């Protein structure tokens, strides 16, 4: 399972 943090807008 690969977790990718969402980029801050």
Curated annotation (Swiss-Prot):
One of its GO terms (biological process) is neuropeptide signaling pathway. Keywords: Amidation, Neuropeptide, Pyrrolidone carboxylic acid, Secreted. The modification Pyrrolidone carboxylic acid is found at residue 1. The modification Leucine amide is found at residue 9. One of its GO terms (cellular component) is extracellular region. It is found in: Secreted. Its main location: secreted. The keyword Secreted applies. Mediates visceral muscle contractile activity (myotropic activity). Belongs to the periviscerokinin family. This is Periviscerokinin-1. The lineage of its organism: Eukaryota, Metazoa, Ecdysozoa, Arthropoda, Hexapoda.
